[in-house]
Structures are given as C-alpha cells and as structure tokens.
C-alpha cells in the first residue's frame, strides 16, 4: 500500500468511545494508519464504541486484498479488546462497497453497522452525545 504524508482522518476521543472522521480521497493505507494509531493509544483498552464518520470522503481506493490486510491487522487489537462496537456513517458508494467487502469476511475481527447520520449511529450504540475524555 502507498504511504501518504498528510492524514485524512481525525480522532476525537470520548468517555469510553471514539469518533473517527475520514475526509477527502481516502486510500487503504490511510485506514490502516488510522487503526494502527488507535490500537497504539493507551485509551484503546477502555474503548467500547467507535463511530466512523465517512460522510466527507470523496472516494475510497481499496482493493479486496488491501481490505483483507486491514482485517488481518485488526485481529490483533480485537484479541486485546473485543468489546468495541463500531458504527459507520457513510453514503459514498466506494466506502459502502469497501464495507460490503469487509462484512463478507466471515471471521472478521469486528461486526459493523452502517447508518446515514451521526444521530442514528449514536442511537444504534446507545451512546450519549459527545463527552470529551478528561485526560
């Protein structure tokens, strides 16, 4: 996978949760870099939910092999913290196609849900509105 200098994602940690905001033209390497950063963060162990906001993504370039590589990476973090619920907010066809490819992996690390809005995502999780983490 190609490497990029700029990172088209933002991480907003909340009490027991995380909102990931992707934007622009996203590559599989960006998604992997995001997951690497999250898994390396000491707050990862307390993470119970992740809302992935991909509404600002213009396009996602990811082959099936790259999605499988991301999934292979996620197996490690899932072993240390299997309690994470993930909900994606996405409408871009290339993002939805990649999520479909991920969901087709039978032994994937995490089960994901796709919603149309942040409100719906929080309702799916039973998560309260953003509460910045104190630390």
Predicted regions mapped to residue ranges:
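Amphipathic, Lys/Arg-enriched alpha-helical "gate/interface" segment within cytosolic domains
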Residues: 2-135
């Amino acid at each position: 996978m190609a490497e990029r200098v700029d990172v088209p994602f933002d991480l907003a940690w909340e009490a027991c949760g995380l909102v990931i905001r992707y934007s622009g033209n996203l590559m599989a390497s960006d998604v992997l870099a995001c997951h690497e950063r999250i898994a390396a963060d000491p707050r990862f162990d307390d993470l119970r939910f992740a809302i992935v906001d991909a509404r600002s993504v213009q396009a996602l370039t990811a082959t099936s092999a790259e999605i499988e590589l991301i999934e292979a990476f996620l197996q490690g973090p899932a072993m240390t913290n299997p309690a994470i619920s993930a909900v994606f907010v996405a409408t871009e066809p290339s993002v939805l196609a990649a999520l479909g490819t991920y969901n087709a992996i039978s032994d994937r690390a995490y089960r994901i849900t796709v919603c149309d809005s942040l409100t719906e995502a929080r309702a799916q999780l039973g998560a309260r509105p953003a509460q910045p983490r104190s630390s």
